[in-house]
UniProtKB/Swiss-Prot annotation:
Biological process annotations from GO: polysaccharide digestion; sucrose catabolic process
InterPro entries xref list: Gal_mutarotase_sf_dom, Glyco_hydro_31_AS, Glyco_hydro_31_C, Glyco_hydro_31_CS, Glyco_hydro_31_N_dom, Glyco_hydro_31_TIM, Glyco_hydro_b, Glycoside_hydrolase_SF
Gene symbol of the encoding locus: SI
Subcellular location: Apical cell membrane
Bilayer disposition of the protein: Single-pass type II membrane protein
Gene Ontology, cellular component aspect: apical plasma membrane; brush border; extracellular exosome; Golgi apparatus; plasma membrane
Region: Sucrase, residue numbers: 1008-1827
Name of the molecule in the record: Sucrase-isomaltase, intestinal
């Protein structure tokens, strides 16, 4: 609670009073003599000594010589003021000023103190009379004779006390520590030496002779109101005493004064005395851990002075000196002994450990309700709502505000109904005023009657102060009557408001006026001769008068016990209100032993970063003091917090033992949900409070051990790692018990913490991964929503499935986290009871377990079980961290019974974590869980992937492991050792936008001899480009290497925000690796922390684990399924003129994959590298990239769905091209047309058969001798034919190969202009063309058909040059040749570019000899076709030079795979420049981003059944690769097709985006018109369906052009939550709504298909098929393909025609497929179908359709294209409309309503509506309603 706000008058009076006080003190100092400064009062706090000092001594102390005056051991003789020589002389001390005022100028010498007289041995120690050495007095009333007694209480505990033998002085009436009566012990860990003249005492550890406590350093001063003793300590490492703000856990020895006197004072950057009175400190002696503690049992005001050496001096204002010295072998033992002395901590109720919300001044109950509501809604784990004094009526205890908090009892019931608790505040001060309604205040009246108040010095008049309710009296909680009254008041109020716990505040005791309403008497109690360095230097400042009387004594003596006594009284009250329950007590003021009764918070802190940091020290100090349930006000009490501060504090506060968010009046709310339901603060708070609740069984067990054994809960690091001196100063991190290390972020704007990691094995709590750190300081990256949590190896942690309250979570299954330590062992324990009954431990009503792990066996041993209700709970999960080998078997046994196999377990190799689930190990029984560990073959990473066969000798020479496997195993026999660590991480720098790390080659570990020499220094850059996309790049920072010159669409600077990022990245060490983790699931989705990483000049290798076996992509290589086969398969990638075949690298190069994760999320990974490579897939699951050059430049896309991940990839590589509308029509081609007549004959046959058909091609046979830009003799009339069919709505596409003949005897402009413009690929550093041979024939050569292929090439093929399409001049030259051919020779509408891998019919060059073997035969040759024949096989030499557009020279070695890509954009641009239309470009060779410029066909396939399903795989893969316009040669390219195969392929091919029938020369015709009428009819029907659906299909093409994504869509993209779809590849979707299920097997008339979980309609009939979420066998007659429309979608259609020119003029139709709720949506994109960039220029029509029950509406989103003849709506077909008959259909259009004719099939729920006569066009909105 905050300080009172004083009025101006009050402030003026206070200032005046302070001035007067200062003057008075000055006078006292000046007049200081033997006579007391004030009159004595008759009933002194101590009986006056028999002998008093009445005269000044005649001599002063003799100063030591300078050599014997080490300044750090000076004991100050004038502690209360600035010293003067005169005062020093009066006190008989040595005056020797120094150049630093911190060092005493006046200090004691040997003339002060006491001498020993008559020392005797007693039954429990020694006893001696001490006589004062005659010397000047300091503060008067010295006691000349005192009694010194010692007690050897235990082997570890020694007590000595110094009292007045003649007069009883005040001694603390501690309620637990009683007078020791023996027996004594003889075998102690300590010796005690007493020096006699002068007296001093030494406590010495026997084992090493080290002096622990030595008072010889200074004199004993013992007067009535001033006691002083000093001790030298053996170590500089001192911890404890309080309550003050120390900032650091280890005490600063630099002349620090720490006053102790309980005070209502908020913590600050000063030495102010605060709320508690704690005199215990601990000192660690050395790295053996030996430590000791010192406790002074004294409650009077005092100060403790700490100075170098070190020396501790006590200056106490009364009572006695009563010291306890406690010895331990460890710091933890010392604290245990202290707690056993003053009282072990209370066992909290389980719910006390839940999170609490509070604030001062909610203002009304409605506000409290809103706070509770929003935090419930945010899912914040939250057990307790607290209200401060604002709930009270006029701040009076035991009342509530009936206006602002009306309904409070009902609200409390709501909390209870939700499993939550309610805690109220009670202040001790009781108002003497009346209630708001004028009635008497019953609480006050009953207290008066029972005489329960603290009285004035007369002992009978209640002292009156002022607190929150105004004028108040103060209960005397040391009075038994008061305790009864207090308990009764608590009980009465509980009957009205059923609170669950009590928060007692202001109990220092606090008053807002000094002393009382009457002031305070001038006497030695209110104005003692010595006042410690307390705030205001006034004893009764902000409290009551020191001469006030309580049952235990004068306020002067018992003031600091007020909170202690109130806690004891409140404990008794709780027992009355909650019989036999623990409840909850939170106190602000404390004393030694308060932890037996109450928890404590650190008071009214400030919302500042430094106070958050200091809270850790405060918490650790109270752990020493025996109050483990402690915490600070999370987010700060005073001042406005900030989101960042509060977020970081919530992270820390989630691990305070007492976790409460509380703030003050007048500031913004700071409960987590106040910051927004989706704020980073809420997410982070929810995450870490969820972790807290998960760990509550562990935390509760720690409290059990604190309660029974005195162990600390929030534990200083030094308590566990005392051998390491670095731990002695750690106070910005702490432990829970021995096992959980908590490292918060404590600095504003920081995301990296310099953290010390002690000497143990540590695991990241959240991932379970083992950390490489040990006994070192690290820069721990902790971004905005993270706190460091690490589990210590060697410990077993009990956990429980969390919930939002402990009421709920306690019912959930339990689990264990086993963090394996040294030798793979671990231990732990677990305590469980009902969580609320008092004394369950003492009564034995609990369950106790011990856990241990060794030899791969977990023993779960129940050592006590007497809580029957608890046995319904069970350990359901066991998570074992640090298992380096795979686990293949788990076995479980109960009570030493035989082991049984347990199958529900998973091993996470990335994190080396075994998770065993579904165990059902009920509490109360013993169990054993056993697992095996094997180094699985699947964990082998191939060390010898080379082309030659591996042998054991070669393997061991390489430094790898050789082990043969079974005959069936495909695992490598030569593999990397698991410890392979090729590179070490020199440094890793984390920032908000990425990571930079430097790697150094480990030459000492570089025994792995890979194919080429390694690069010694590497750099890793990770860039968080977007929230869902990141890049990680590994390169040589000292030498620029080739990087792919393909432009990508990535932000120039990262635009991600930490809070919204979907991923976290970590650089791993030993070995180096990168781990990327999906935040939402914690799943590691990239993990290259594996052996085998290599970065050589011509060999780069990196492996990564995969999150599942479901991976798709990589190409272009023929695959047998859409999902990759991970059974040790390697696929090479290097563009080659290679017809598709299993594992044969083919035309394109696409190093991209998409992976599904076990949770159903998806991500994509793209490696931007264009060098030859291969990728190995293994069942780990894992993959390994090997590439022969460039760098590693990865991009990852986080999805989280397959379609979204694909869109994210397309966003980077560019959205797919928008084809012309006509390009979606059916197309015909073949290689081998003899002349134009054959083409004409085909065309006429198709038209006669009325088979829809849009595009005709000719292959290279139309050319003269296969020369580009020529027309052969047999095709001289081709241009006229093309003009004719184009006039009939057809389109024409020609083929162009890149190879340009250089052997022409006549003018060949293409070559000649190419030479002039320097466009051809050349040998490096020369002007010579690198010649090759492809299709062009030599002029004037007769082809000998009998020659072999190679002989024919040599004999008849011309030398050809390859254009270098990287050059700007080449693009210009290419465009000119295309334009000239179009304008001068023949028209065309699209271009087909082939042979652009680039393909050559010779190896490298015309001589078959290249000039650089290192490039053509690299040290490592990827697993490619013709692996031993060199990279130049059937292409050009790798050393050929190409020139990028910026003039950079590059090797063909690096850019070979970019050749087709480099040709596509120039071809696309030239086509559009030439025709002025959109057109289409079809390319055989492709690279990522190619889809921006054109389409792709799947190459020269075979007329075989197995090539049909592979075409679906290929299309779906190219959909991932960003090329939506794809298809295969329908009916097959090679070999003669056959009737049934071609039938089924025509049915399938009708739904390829690129639908072309194409075959090779010298095989039979296979066009639809070439078979028979039945075939023609089938083709006509199926193509009519395609043409009908073209508006829908075109709209889908637009969607992915605008937004990325897939048109040919795998089922898993839409139905990823249905696991069967993950394997489906013989079906596919058009967009989201149209499913195609072809027949892919010969001579069958059924097809087995998976029907996803949605409503589906048979396209042919419109009927609901009534099947979903299962496999189904469908009929499929020879002329039928199964097509289904998904419910919930609207498909725009159009009547078909001969070609799209005519179909676009037909009526449109809408297929409305209703979902289960009679809802559906769809859209139409429409433009002129051929203009360039219509979408980009807004020249299009966009219509949105919606079905809502019985009403269909359209909404015009864009009206940039209007052609009413193309968009006339002719009909509407509603499928699945429902069973209600339709009586009427109404059209609302252009403001008019009209009835429409309709036809209804009620049985099949189909409604057909006719609009043909109403001239409705889709450019205007429509509404159609049926009823």
């Amino acid at each position: 609670m905050a300080r009172k706000k004083f009025s101006g008058l009050e402030i003026s009076l206070i200032v005046l009073f302070v001035i007067v006080t200062i003057i008075a003190i000055a006078l006292i100092v000046v007049l200081a003599t033997k006579t007391p400064a004030v009159d004595e009062i008759s009933d002194s706090t101590s009986t006056p000594a028999t002998t008093r000092v009445t005269t000044n001594p005649s001599d002063s102390g003799k100063c030591p010589n300078v050599l014997n005056d080490p300044v750090n051991v000076r004991i100050n003789c004038i502690p209360e003021q600035f010293p003067t020589e005169g005062i020093c002389a009066q006190r008989g001390c040595c005056w020797r000023p120094w150049n630093d005022s911190l060092i005493p100028w006046c200090f004691f010498v040997d003339n002060h103190g006491y001498n020993v007289q008559d020392m005797t041995t007693t039954s429990i120690g020694v006893e001696a009379k001490l006589n004062r050495i005659p010397s000047p007095t300091l503060f008067g009333n010295d006691i000349n004779s005192v009694l010194f007694t010692t007690q050897n209480q235990t082997p570890n505990r020694f007590r000595f006390k110094i009292t007045d033998p003649n007069n009883r002085r005040y001694e603390v009436p501690h309620q637990y520590v009683k007078e020791f009566t023996g027996p004594t012990v003889s075998d102690t860990l300590y010796d005690v030496k007493v020096a006699q003249n002068p007296f001093s005492i030494q406590v010495i550890r026997k084992s090493n002779g080290k002096t622990l406590f030595d008072t010889s350093i200074g004199p004993l001063v013992y007067s009535d109101q001033y006691l002083q003793i000093s001790t030298r300590l053996p170590s500089d490492y001192i911890y404890g005493i309080g309550e003050q703000v120390h900032k650091r856990f280890r005490h600063d020895l630099s002349w620090k004064t720490w006053p102790i006197f309980t005070r209502d004072q908020l913590p600050g950057d000063n030495n102010n005395n605060l709320y508690g009175h704690q005199t215990f400190f601990m000192c660690i002696e050395d790295t053996s851990g030996k430590s000791f503690g010192v406790f002074l049992m004294n409650s009077n005001a005092m100060e403790i002075f700490i100075q170098p050496t070190p020396i501790v001096t006590y200056r106490v204002t009364g009572g006695i000196l009563d010291f306890y010295i406690l010895l331990g072998d460890t710091p933890e033992q010392v604290v245990q002994q202290y707690q056993q002395l003053v009282g072990l901590p209370a066992m909290p109720a389980y719910w006390n450990l839940g999170f609490q919300l509070s604030r001062w001044n909610y203002k009304s109950l409605d506000v409290v309700k809103e706070v509770v509501r929003r935090n419930r809604e945010a899912g914040i784990p939250f057990d307790t709502q607290v209200t401060d004094i604002d709930y009270m009526e006029d701040k009076k205890d035991f009342t509530y505000d009936q206006v602002a908090f009306n309904g409070l009892p009902q609200f409390v019931q709501d909390l209870h109904d939700h499993g939550q608790k309610y805690v109220i505040i009670l202040d001790p001060a009781i108002s003497i005023g009346r209630r708001a309604n004028g009635t008497t205040y019953a609480t006050y009246e009953r207290g008066n009657t029972q005489h329960v108040w603290i009285n004035e010095s007369d002992g009978s008049t209640p002292i009156i102060g002022e607190v929150w309710p105004g004028l108040t009296v103060y209960p005397d909680f040391t009075n038994p009557n008061c305790i009864d009254w207090w308990a009764n008041e608590c009980s009465i109020f509980h009957q009205e408001v059923q609170y669950d716990g009590l928060w007692i505040d202001m109990n220092e005791v606090s008053s807002f006026i000094q002393g009382s309403t009457k002031g305070c008497n001038v006497n030695k109690l209110n104005y003692p001769p010595f006042t410690p360095d307390i705030l205001d230097k006034l004893m009764y400042s902000k409290t009551i008068c020191m001469d006030a009387v309580q049952n235990w004594g004068k306020q002067y003596d018992v003031h600091s016990l007020y909170g202690y006594s109130m806690a004891i009284a409140t404990e008794q009250a709780v027992q009355k209100v909650f019989p036999n329950k623990r409840s909850f007590i939170l106190t602000r003021s404390t004393f030694a032993g308060s932890g037996r009764h109450a928890a404590h918070w650190l008071g009214d802190n400030t919302a500042s970063w430094e106070q958050m940091e200091w809270s850790i020290t405060g918490m650790l100090e109270f752990s020493l003091f025996g109050i483990p349930l402690v915490g600070a006000d999370i987010c700060g009490f005073v001042a406005e917090t900030t989101e960042e501060l509060c977020r970081r504090w919530m992270q820390l506060g989630a691990f305070y033992p007492f976790s409460r968010n509380h703030n003050s009046d007048g500031y913004e709310h700071q409960d987590p949900a106040f910051f927004g339901q989706n704020s980073l603060l809420v997410k982070s708070s929810r995450q870490y409070l969820t972790i807290r609740y998960t760990l509550l069984p562990f935390l509760y067990t720690l409290f059990y051990k604190a309660h029974v054994f005195g162990e600390t809960v929030a534990r200083p690091v030094l308590h566990e790692f005392y051998e390491d001196t670095n731990s002695w100063i750690e106070d910005t991190e702490f432990l829970w018990g021995p096992a959980l290390l908590i490292t918060p972020v404590l600095k504003q704007g920081a995301d990296t913490v310099s953290a010390y990691i002690p000497d143990a094995i540590w695991y990241d709590y959240e991932s379970g991964a083992k950390r490489p750190w040990r006994k070192q300081r690290v820069d721990m990256y902790l971004p905005a929503d993270k706190i460091g949590l690490h589990l210590r190896g060697g410990y077993i942690i009990p956990i429980q499935e969390p919930d939002v309250t402990t009421t709920a979570s306690r019912k959930n299954p339990l689990g264990l986290i086993v963090a394996l330590g040294e030798n793979n062992t671990a231990k732990g324990d677990f305590f469980w009871d009902d969580g609320e009954t008092k004394d369950t431990i003492q009564n034995g009503n609990y369950i106790l377990y011990t856990f241990s792990v060794s030899n791969n066996t977990l023993d779960i041993v129940c050592t006590h079980s007497s809580y029957q209700e608890g046995t319904t709970l069970a350990f359901q999960t066991v998570k074992i961290l640090g298992l380096t080998d795979s686990v293949t078997e788990v076995r479980v046994a109960e009570n030493n019974q035989p082991m049984n196999a347990h199958s529900n377990f998973t091993y996470d190799a990335s994190n080396q974590v075994l998770l065993i689930a579904d165990l059902k190990l009920n509490l109360g029984r013993n169990f054993s869980v056993q697992w095996n560990q094997i180094f699985s073959e699947n964990e082998r990473f191939n060390c010898y992937p080379d082309a030659d066969l591996a042998t054991e000798q070669k393997c061991t020479q390489r430094g790898c492991v050789w082990r043969t496997g079974s005959s069936l195993s495909k695992a490598p026999e030569c593999y990397f050792p698991r410890q392979d660590n090729s590179y070490s991480v020199n440094s890793a720098r984390y920032s908000s936008m990425g990571i930079t790390a430097d790697l150094q080659l480990n030459t000492a570990n570089a025994r792995i001899k890979l194919p080429s020499d390694p690069i010694s220094t590497l750099r890793v850059e990770v860039k968080y480009h977007k929230n869902d996309m990141l890049q990680f790049k590994i390169y040589d920072p000292q030498k620029k290497r080739y990087e792919v010159p393909v432009p990508l669409n990535i932000p120039t600077t990262p635009i991600s925000t930490y809070e919204d990022r979907l991923y976290d990245v970590e650089i791993k060490e030993n070995p180096f690796g990168i781990q990327i983790r999906r935040r939402s699931s914690g799943r590691v989705i990239w993990d290259s922390w594996l052996p085998g990483f290599a970065f050589n000049d011509q060999f780069i290798q990196i492996s990564t684990r995969l999150p599942s076996e479901y991976i798709y992509g990589f190409g272009e290589v023929e695959h047998t399924a859409f999902k990759r086969d991970l059974n040790w398969n390697t696929w090479g990638m290097f563009t080659r003129d290679q017809p598709p075949g299993y594992k044969l690298n083919s035309y394109g190069f696409h190093p991209y994959y998409m992976a599904l994760e076990e949770e159903g999320n998806a991500h994509g990974v793209f490696l931007l590298n264009s060098n030859a490579m291969d990728v190995t897939f293994q069942p780990t699951p894992a993959l390994t990239y090997r590439t022969v050059g460039g760098i590693l430049d990865f991009y990852m896309f986080l999805g989280p769905t397959p379609e979204v991940a694909t869109k994210q990839y397309h966003e980077v590589i560019g959205h797919p091209v928008m084809p012309a509308y006509w390009a979606l029509g059916f197309q015909l081609c073949r290689y081998g047309y003899a002349n134009t007549s054959e083409v004409r004959e085909l065309y006429d046959a198709m038209v006669a058969a009325n088979i829809p058909y849009d595009v005709q091609y000719t292959d290279i046979d139309y050319m003269e001798r296969q020369l580009d830009f020529t027309i052969g003799e047999a095709f001289q009339d081709l241009p006229q034919f093309v003009d004719k069919i184009r006039g009939e709505g057809m389109r024409y596409i020609i083929i162009l190969d890149p190879a340009i003949s250089g052997n022409e005897t006549k003018t060949y402009p293409a070559f000649e202009r190419g030479q002039q413009n320097d466009v051809f690929v050349k040998w490096p550093n020369t002007n010579d063309i690198c010649w090759a041979k492809v299709w062009p024939d030599l002029p004037n050569i007769t082809i000998d058909k009998t020659l072999t292929e190679d002989e024919a090439v040599n004999a008849s093929r011309a030398h050809v040059a390859f254009p270098d399409f990287f050059r700007t001049s080449t693009a210009e030259w290419w465009a000119r040749e295309i334009v000239d051919f179009y304008n001068e020779k023949m028209k065309f509408d699209g271009l087909w570019i082939d042979m652009n891998e680039p393909s050559s019919f010779v190896n490298g060059t015309t001589t078959n000899q290249c000039r650089n073997d290192e490039l053509n035969y690299p040290p490592y040759f990827p697993e490619l076709t013709k692996r031993t024949d060199g990279l130049h096989f059937r292409t050009i030499c790798m050393e050929a030079e190409q020139i990028l557009s910026d003039g950079t020279s590059v090797l063909h070695y690096d850019v070979h795979n970019l050749y087709g890509w480099s040709q596509m954009k120039p071809t696309h641009d030239a086509l559009q420049k030439t025709t002025g239309k959109r057109g289409i470009v079809i390319s055989r060779s492709t690279y990522p981003t190619s889809g921006r410029w054109g389409g792709h066909w799947l190459g020269d396939n075979y007329a075989r059944w197995d090539n049909m399903d592979k075409s679906i795989i290929g299309m779906m893969e190219f959909s991932l690769f960003g090329m939506s316009y794809t298809g295969a040669d329908i009916c097959g390219f090679f070999n003669n097709s056959e009737y049934h195969l071609c039938t089924r392929w025509m049915q399938l091919g009708a739904f390829y985006p690129y639908s072309r029938n194409h075959n090779i020369a010298n095989t039979r015709r296979q066009d639809p018109a070439s078979w028979n009428e039945t075939f023609a009819e089938m083709s006509r029907n199926i193509l009519n369906i395609r043409y009908t659906l073209l508006p829908y299909f075109y709209t889908q093409m637009h969607e992915i052009h605008a937004n990325g994504g897939t048109v040919i869509r795998p089922l898993l993209h839409e139905f990823f939550d249905e696991k069967p779809t993950w394997d489906i590849f013989k079906q596919f979707l058009w967009g989201p709504a149209f499913m195609v299920t072809p027949v892919l097997e010969p001579y069958v008339q059924t097809v087995n298909a998976y029907v996803p979980n949605a409503r589906w309609f048979d396209y042919h009939t419109g009927k609901d098929i009534g099947v979903r979420g299962q496999f189904q066998t469908f009929n499929a007659s020879y002329d039928t393909i199964n097509l289904h429309v998904r419910g919930g979608h609207i498909l725009p259609c159009q009547e078909p025609a001969q070609n799209t020119f005519y179909s676009r003029q037909k009526h449109m139709k809408l297929i409305v497929a209703a979902d289960d709720n009679q809802m559906a949506q769809g859209s139409l994109f429409w433009d002129d179908g051929e203009s360039i960039d219509t979408y980009e220029r807004d020249l299009y029509l966009s219509v949105q359709f919606n079905l809502n029950q019985t009403t269909l509406t359209s909404t015009i989103l864009k009206r940039g294209y209007i052609n009413k003849s193309e968009t006339r709506l002719g009909s509407l077909h509603v499928w699945g409309k429902g069973t209600t008959p339709v009586n009427a259909v109404t059209l609302t259009y252009n403001g008019n309503k009209n009835s429409l004719p309709f036809n209804e099939d009620t049985t099949n729920m189909i409604l057909r509506i006719d609009l043909t006569t109403h001239n409705v066009t889709l450019e205007e909105p429509i509404e159609i309603n049926w009823s």
